[in-house]
Amino acid sequence: MTEDSWHPICELGAVPEHDLIGVEDDGCELIIVRLDGDRHFVLDGRCTHGKASLAEGFVVGDEIECPKHNGRFDVATGDAIARPVTVGLGTYQCRVRDGKVEIRR
């Protein structure tokens, strides 16, 4: 992929440390998770079980907890790690450049 395939989806300052926010990119709901200041992750924004918005969810350690049925996903891999979820989330390459969180899609 070329350098041009990266594009910004939000300002870094919009994502609180050890928390997440929801964003929309080209019609897709995504979440951005910020851990320990410089670790950022971008994942699909809907739970694979009950379709709840994960933007309303919680960061618990290195996991995302769904607000609807308390299923959990691994922040780094998107893997489903606590029932009732059994299907993982899609993940996207991300980086921080010039104060913005960028993804490659």
Spans of model-derived segments:
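Short cysteine clusters
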Residues: 47, 66-69
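Short Gly/Pro-enriched loop/turn and capping motifs at secondary-structure junctions
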Residues: 72
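Short glycine/proline-centered loop/turn elements that form peptide/ligand docking sites
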Residues: 83
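N-terminal pre-ligand scaffold of iron-sulfur
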Residues: 1-61, 75, 79, 87-105
